[in-house]
Amino acid sequence: MSRALLSVRGLGVRFLGERSVAALSDVDFDVARGEVLGLLGESGSGKSVTLRTLLGLHAPRTTRVTGQVNFDGEDVLSLPAEALRRYRGGRVSMIFQEPGLAFDPVYTIGAQIAESIRAHDAVDARTATARALEMLERVQIPQAGRRLQAYPHELSGGMRQRAMIALALACRPLLLLADEPTTALDATVQIQILLLLRELQRETGMAMIFVSHDIGAAIEVADRIAVMYAGRIVEENAVAELVAAPRHHYTAGLLASTVGEAERGRPLATIPGAPPDLSAPMQGCAFAPRCVAAVERCRSELPPLVRDGARALACWRPRATGDGDGPRGPIGPS
């Protein structure tokens, strides 16, 4: 891989309070220019925390962030306030999971997009409004001129998400962070948004980190996938290789539990149990209590993330590369 646009090394996030929670631990990954990296995992695995950390959105008084985040040669975690403001929205932008909460309800869609443009580019109000209209047309919102004057609550969920994409791309970012952008949408609209995101990514050449708990959505959009569990990356590989031969037992379980893998007349595969409590001290592999292949070493010794070219794996007892598409039933201990 050529020099990465984004390089994350040893990233850790701990939320402080009555109970200290280790939300991220020793996270490493790179994103090249023009590449789409999928972050995949269950709720609570650290995907959204990763994105918010990349934008510096955590309250410093209640959050301890460690490690390094290097974006295009800059140390993001040490940026002063003004440089961080220019970085957010200008060079790196984010699509939030629920656009209804991300938009200000008392301003029109057009006003909010134009304001973002003027905050990062030296243009007048007329030019900013024209660019806002262009962005709404670009994300295929019908009657874009009329929608420019609409308030967020006047748009459907799918329209609001398209408007959110327009806002995120208005300043031509080098990296787009997409935090489960289709979760709140119906199946038909989900497909439309996924296709739109991929089309815009290819058209602009920007890099993207696509967060999802839906492995099917991640496969459609991403070039590579990093699988997260309990605040750590446990496996990373190119999409085709990850799907054809998952090495980590958690990855195999996610693949096996999709509807596409189901056999008629048989129940859907599941991963028994639940993710661990991240406020409690942890020994060994966090997935060990749910893993059929776990042995004593798995429970007592944390497996490091070992990289081999574009692949990475953290497992003491990985699946053989010829194991196929993953188990067809529960993969946890009986």
Model-assigned labels for residue ranges:
Residues 170-174:
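A short, proline-enriched helix->beta-strand linker immediately N-terminal to the Walker B motif
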Residues 74-75, 127-146, 255-256:
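Conserved ABC ATPase "signature" region
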Residues 4, 142-146, 236-334:
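Short catalytic/signature loops enriched in Gly
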Residues 63-75:
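Conserved ABC transporter NBD signature motif
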Residues 40-42:
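The feature captures the beta-strand-to-loop junction immediately N-terminal to the Walker
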Residues 177, 181, 185-266:
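P-loop NTP-binding/switch modules centered on Walker-like glycine-rich loops
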